[in-house]
Amino acid sequence: MLYIKNGRLYTQSFSYIIPDGLCLVPDSITTAPDTLTFETLDGKFLIMLSPYETEKTPDEELNGFLKMGCHKMMSDIFEVNRGGMIGKGVFYRDNSWSYEHYEERTRYPENEEGQNAFELYIEHEVQTEADRNKIQDIMNHPKFKVLIGSIRYEPDVCQKITEEQ
């Protein structure tokens, strides 16, 4: 379910403010049904918001795929606190440097769908050498700053909305 109230978009256990100028990607290939994917009009940035289920810690997940050797870290893994959730984040790029990424994995109490984890994923397409090392700038871009800063874990939000009706 997606529900909009007072400028916030609500999903199963989360809410967000979606700023003007971002495009919803309806046919996104994802692993979780509640995933929302947006991109900028120029297609240079993609952002994915995805609740999911896991038994691993954020450290285990991030270190697991980074150790595969397909990516180069652009930062150390660091602690994050996002919308009432604690986790880990990292900036990295692919080996060919055609994309730079920011990934954040956080945990929350299991919801009624069995989900207990949240992924914030941002991808930056590097088209020229001048585009390199720009992924960290995205965190200060006004549109993404609004969206990222608005992420809130809201348990039982669907039930609360239904009761208000």
Features from the language model and the residues they span:
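Sec/Tat-exported extracytoplasmic proteins
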Residues: P26, G69-C70, R152-P155
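Secretory pathway targeting signatures of secreted, lumenal, and periplasmic proteins
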Residues: N6-M68
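Signature of long, low-cysteine stretches enriched in small and polar/charged residues
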Residues: N63-F118, T162-E164
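Surface-exposed amphipathic alpha-helical segments
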Residues: L22, F118-Q165
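Short, surface-exposed beta-strand/loop "edge" segments at domain boundaries and coil↔beta transitions
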Residues: D42-L49, T54-P58, W97-H101, V126-K134
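Short, hydrophobic/aromatic-rich segments at coil-to-beta transitions
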Residues: L2-G7, A32-T35, N81-F91
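Residues that act as N-cap/strand-start positions at coil-to-secondary-structure junctions
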Residues: Y3, Y10, T30-A32, K72-M74, ...
